């Protein structure tokens, strides 16, 4: 069923119909389209287009259709309707006859689809926020269980300073918290209803659009009809949120892929999130994490594609905007799946503490402590930095960690070094000294865990 046709003397070419139709993807807006139609039927009563009895009939039929859709959304794809709006209207007419043809009075598919998509975005943000919280909680639990797991921290993928697996876990809690905040901000901006904006110039009926917005659960109605039907900022914002969120998940995945590798050996992933090789029986591949890392590109591609689609469009609605949905649906589905998978990866992960400790003791990660020790003895930092560099070269030559150099060896580089240097060079001392807010000291990490738990309640 097409919602247009009187102007045309020839039927559309079948190839054009297939090219033009959007039901194969916008069927996902069925529930939102029906909910919007119920609200619109109520608005039509207020302006005398529908009687109260007619509205009750329409609402009952629409609610029945909503239940049918929830039971079997795939039924929609069996239709040859042009789009979800055509499908819903056709089904409504099947149920109530000619009365169903009155529902579209004063409404355009332009404001209708804009409303549907915003309602869908609001629902999906709720799902994303829940999945984000689930992963944050999994990371906090991982941190709680691994406060004593000392490991090397890296810069340039070289061992830099000792940290703990708990501190590493909490770093990703911070990233996810920012993702959560961005989603909440986006929700505030998109929480305005375009319904009643018509095709572009507003509806010809004096509908109370603020009341209509309230019925649909929006905070308010939009202020300009031209902008209302052509605004896709919320699509761009959500794709941007997803792109940033997937960058965080990709980095999370990359870290764990490395930690799980034979070269690092810091963790072992559960069998539930790994796979084997068809040829090499010894392999246990981190496929879940590699897929998270790989899917980042498709999400960022959706953002780039949507920006290119919108950049040259004049006001108001253009058919180009039909391209807003497939990329958005796929990107947010992907982000949601990856958030769930990230939590699953952490469920059952084993941290190999002895190996983490061994790696932390290698790579001269306590070099900064020796420099700070020299500064405390009155040596200018830049000079101390140079002295420690020379000491590291000597330790490498001898094949020893810094703390195993003799006092005589260390005093070759600075006479101020005494026996009191050795406690300073221990891993525990390295951690304990980072006691400022946000640092890796056990006290600060414990406080960060407590703060995160309090925020996530």
From Swiss-Prot:
GO biological process, one term: arginine biosynthetic process via ornithine
Pathway: Amino-acid biosynthesis; L-arginine biosynthesis; L-arginine from L-ornithine and carbamoyl phosphate: step 3/3
Broad class of enzyme this protein falls into: lyase
Superkingdom of this protein's organism: Bacteria
Cellular component GO terms held in the UniProt record: cytosol
Protein's cellular compartments: Cytoplasm
Protein EC: 4.3.2.1
Keyword annotations from UniProtKB, A to Z: Amino-acid biosynthesis, Arginine biosynthesis, Cytoplasm, Lyase
Family from the record: Belongs to the lyase 1 family. Argininosuccinate lyase subfamily.
Name of this protein: Argininosuccinate lyase
Gene for this chain: argH
């Amino acid at each position: 069923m097409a919602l247009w046709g009187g102007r045309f003397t020839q039927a559309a070419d079948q190839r054009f119909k297939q090219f033009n139709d959007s039901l194969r993807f916008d069927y996902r807006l069925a529930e939102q389209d029906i909910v919007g139609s119920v609200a619109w039927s109520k608005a039509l009563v207020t302006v005398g287009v529908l009687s109260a009895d007619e509205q009750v009939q329409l609402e009952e039929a629409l609610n029945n259709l909503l239940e049918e859709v929830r039971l079997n959304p795939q039924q929609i794809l069996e239709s040859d309707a042009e789009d979800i709006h055509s499908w819903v209207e056709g089904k409504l007419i099947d149920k109530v006859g000619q009365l169903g043809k009155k529902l579209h009075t004063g409404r355009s598919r332009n404001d209708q689809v804009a409303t549907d998509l915003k309602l869908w975005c609001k629902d999906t943000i709720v799902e994303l926020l829940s999945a984000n919280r689930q992963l944050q909680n999994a990371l906090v639990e991982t941190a709680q269980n691994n406060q004593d797991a000392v490991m090397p921290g890296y810069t340039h993928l070289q061992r830099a300073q000792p940290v703990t697996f708990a501190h590493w876990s909490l770093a990703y809690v911070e990233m996810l918290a920012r993702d959560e905040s961005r989603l909440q901000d986006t929700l505030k901006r998109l929480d305005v209803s375009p319904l009643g904006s018509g095709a572009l110039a507003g509806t010809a009926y004096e509908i109370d659009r603020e009341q209509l917005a309230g019925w649909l659960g929006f905070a308010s109605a939009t202020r300009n009809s031209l902008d209302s039907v052509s605004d896709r900022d919320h699509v761009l914002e959500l794709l941007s949120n997803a792109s940033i969120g997937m960058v965080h998940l990709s980095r999370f995945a990359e870290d764990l892929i490395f930690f799980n590798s034979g070269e690092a050996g810091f963790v072992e992933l559960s069998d539930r999130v790994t796979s084997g090789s068809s040829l090499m029986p010894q392999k246990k591949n981190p496929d879940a994490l590699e897929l998270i890392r790989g899917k980042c590109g498709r999400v960022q591609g959706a953002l780039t594609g949507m920006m290119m689609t919108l950049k040259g469009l004049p006001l108001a609605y253009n058919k180009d905007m039909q391209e807003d949905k497939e990329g958005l649906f796929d990107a947010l589905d992907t982000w949601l799946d990856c958030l769930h998978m990230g939590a699953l990866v952490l469920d059952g992960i084993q941290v190999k503490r002895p190996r983490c400790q061994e790696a932390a003791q290698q790579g001269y990660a306590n070099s900064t402590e020796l420099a700070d020790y020299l500064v405390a003895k009155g040596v200018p930092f830049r000079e101390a930095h140079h002295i420690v560099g020379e000491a590291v070269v000597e330790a490498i030559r001898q094949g020893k960690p810094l703390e195993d150099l003799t006092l005589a060896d260390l005093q070759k580089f600075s006479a101020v070094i005494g026996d009191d240097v050795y406690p300073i060079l221990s891993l525990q001392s390295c951690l304990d000294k980072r006691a400022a807010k946000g640092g890796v000291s056990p006290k600060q990490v414990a406080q960060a865990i407590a703060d995160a738990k309090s925020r996530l309640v």
